[in-house]
Swiss-Prot record:
UniProt GO BP: G protein-coupled receptor signaling pathway
Cystines in this chain: C105-C182
Gene of this entry: mtnr1c
Function: High affinity receptor for melatonin. Likely to mediate the potent effects of melatonin on pigment aggregation in melanophores. The activity of this receptor is mediated by pertussis toxin sensitive G proteins that inhibit adenylate cyclase activity.
Keywords in alphabetical order: Cell membrane, Disulfide bond, G-protein coupled receptor, Glycoprotein, Membrane, Receptor, Transducer, Transmembrane, Transmembrane helix
A GO cellular component annotation in the UniProt record: plasma membrane
InterPro entries: GPCR_Rhodpsn, GPCR_Rhodpsn_7TM, Mel_rcpt_1C, Melatonin_rcpt
UniProt-recorded name of the protein: Melatonin receptor type 1C
Amino acid sequence: MMEVNSTCLDCRTPGTIRTEQDAQDSASQGLTSALAVVLIFTIVVDVLGNILVILSVLRNKKLQNAGNLFVVSLSIADLVVAVYPYPVILIAIFQNGWTLGNIHCQISGFLMGLSVIGSVFNITAIAINRYCYICHSLRYDKLYNQRSTWCYLGLTWILTIIAIVPNFFVGSLQYDPRIFSCTFAQTVSSSYTITVVVVHFIVPLSVVTFCYLRIWVLVIQVKHRVRQDFKQKLTQTDLRNFLTMFVVFVLFAVCWAPLNFIGLAVAINPFHVAPKIPEWLFVLSYFMAYFNSCLNAVIYGVLNQNFRKEYKRILMSLLTPRLLFLDTSRGGTEGLKSKPSPAVTNNNQADMLGEARSLWLSRRNGAKMVIIIRPRKAQIAIIHQIFWPQSSWATCRQDTKITGEEDGCRELCKDGISQR
């Protein structure tokens, strides 16, 4: 009986091993597929979103200020990983290993580090800019004039390059098969890993935390009228801009904190801590960090009204590159109309098409207006106004930065419209 049981156990053991191995392989394939899906989604949103951010600032003069210069810089840093490192990681995932050679591995690791550190330092620069704008408003124009702002931006990227160069001398850029990436190896040098975490993560985030805490304190004091001596009036736009960048900071900290704290723990006691870290947690911490690069552009669109409006204009211009017809004659947006205005005759239609960026229809107090926006001269011309029951022509022109908001157009022309 003992021999039979022993024989049966011997017969079942290989099958059990194969079953466990098959389960592990299946789980590994499922995890790999999930990582590929997450990375593809991140690349698409990263590229489209950050291009929208850059185009929005370039197109809209309302967004062209010192603070948004660092926002564009942050978008460029986020774009870097989507253009090269993430695609080669995808290749490694599909090939189930690194097949591109050591040169591509080093380039990918360098650009990955450049993007990450550039993002950290740009977020820090944005926080300092917001702090100076709100807490030291009287000196802000001197601190952030055009020349000094470009100097700050250049300094940000110089520090970024200086911070990433030591990786080549330490030899810490290596391929890690668990995450299919050529990245910073946490176990190469404990002292260097601790230095990286402190300089690249803890110190910048401490500076950002200090800046935003001071802003929050000031906002609360002004709101409850504790600071009667505060000269600048905090507008809702200022508060929304501050809130937007604060959310950017919080999400960055949340996405990157697990990876940095794991690296710090491993560096302090590598032989004891490293074997105890589950592989799924290690992989999750990396892909959380990777995912962060696509979030900022989404945050701007959700929380910042100016960016959201410019996103819509850019996307609409892709659908109707010559004219956009927005009908709000019934008090709400009904959609885009692809029909020309009845005011546009055969004689002047070509000229209007040539200089018009978009066509906006609205009705207010029984009047229907067609507004042509001229992007080159930033002018608004109300070329047709129909009153019920009678019709009349009216024109109003003025150099302005208004870009089509209904309230702005009403203010522009309410004081007097010259009859043709």
